């Protein structure tokens, strides 16, 4: 049976704006890929959105962030500006294990909040169409 897996997350942008300067750089490098950091160009609003998308992806995978490395979930923009979720290493393994065949991500912001949803089409091996 074909199904959907969905994850949603909401992040306060102030959490990123108010990061302790002593840990900020280490935290950002642990959570985001070099490409994500470059693309965000220091925008805490954009980084909060990417963070929410990573959390939403982990929830859709059914494992939470503890089972996958932050940097194995990469959120970058397509040429037309849409966010794209790329899965690497353990995250890709988990997606394949759960039967993910395609997925999408959506990110939205207000002045204070960043929200993301990830939806995946799940087709377990041997599923009937």
Describe every region a protein language model picked out:
Residues 1-129:
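Core catalytic alpha/beta fold that binds nucleotide/phospho-ligands
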